[in-house]
Structure formats: structure tokens, C-alpha cells
């Protein structure tokens, strides 16, 4: 009888240990994987230009859902940097210099991240944005735009679409 009690206690311990080791982090310190920009720093996007258009959602992860299956999107390019986006990691304030664009072949990409609590730009903040795009004439083909947050349940949305040039320097 004593050996049965020991076995039951041992199994109970294993179950409790397994439950306590389960990673169920709801603090926002983890999150969804968002790619970083790749390639060399872009040197050919020196002219100021603004592009706008509609991006359509192609993927969604996470318990929280913005419900945005499409969105109006603006992208500002100047001095090899981008501003714009939907969540603010690319937006910044009036004195925000923009996010560095990188180039690999004919594709451009940019990544930015910030902490929503204090607005500081850090490498692994709770708000992340990534964009990969090509430019042909007055058109930007957004291969993927990824927006991710880790607060309020968190989510990661991926969008793609086409943007058209709306202004440039001197217009």
C-alpha cells in the first residue's frame, strides 16, 4: 500500500511541476517574431516622396484582432529613411528622423520598434513594424508590412498591396 502512495505522490509532483513550468507569459515580454531589415544601408532613396494606397491583410496571429482586413497606408521616404506605418514605430513625432532603409538586390526593407509606455525607440519594444517593398516609377509594391504588439493580448498582422506616389519635393 505504501508503494502505491509513493507512486501517486510522485506522479502528482510530476504533474504539478509540468504545470508550473508551462510558459504562459502574459506580461508582454515575449511576442511575435517580426523580421529585421536586411541588406546594406540604402543610398539611392534621397528624394523626398510620399506614397499612399490600400494594403490588404494576408495573415493574422494572436488572440487580439484589430479587425482591419484592409487599411489606408502612407509611406514617406526621404534621405534613405521611411516614416509612416500604422502603429507608430515608423511614425514618431515631428522631429523623428525616420527609420533607416536597407537594400538587398531590388528590395528595400525597414524595421522599427518602440515601447508604448514611454515612447522610447528600442530594439525589442512592445510595438514593432517591418516593411519590405520595391519601387518602380511612381509605384511602391509593398511585399509585406508587418505590425505587431505584445500588450492587450497581442497580435501580429501582415499586409501587402500597392502604393502610388502622391507628392515629391518641389510639387
Which sequence ranges carry the predicted segments?
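Small side chains
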Residues: 12, 18, 53, 84-85, ...
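Contiguous, well-ordered beta-strand patches that form the walls/edges
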Residues: 83-137
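Short, exposed beta-strand-loop hairpins at the edges of beta-sheets
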Residues: 138-158
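Short, low-complexity, Pro/Ser/Thr/Gly-rich segments in the mature regions of secreted, periplasmic
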Residues: 160-171
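Short, solvent-exposed loop/hinge segments that bridge or flank secondary-structure elements
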Residues: 36-82, 115-130
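N-terminal glycine/threonine-rich, aromatic-flanked beta-hairpin/loop signature
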Residues: 61-105, 142-149
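Bacterial Sec-dependent N-terminal signal peptides
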Residues: 16-47, 167-169
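Sec-dependent bacterial lipoprotein signal peptides
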Residues: 1-20
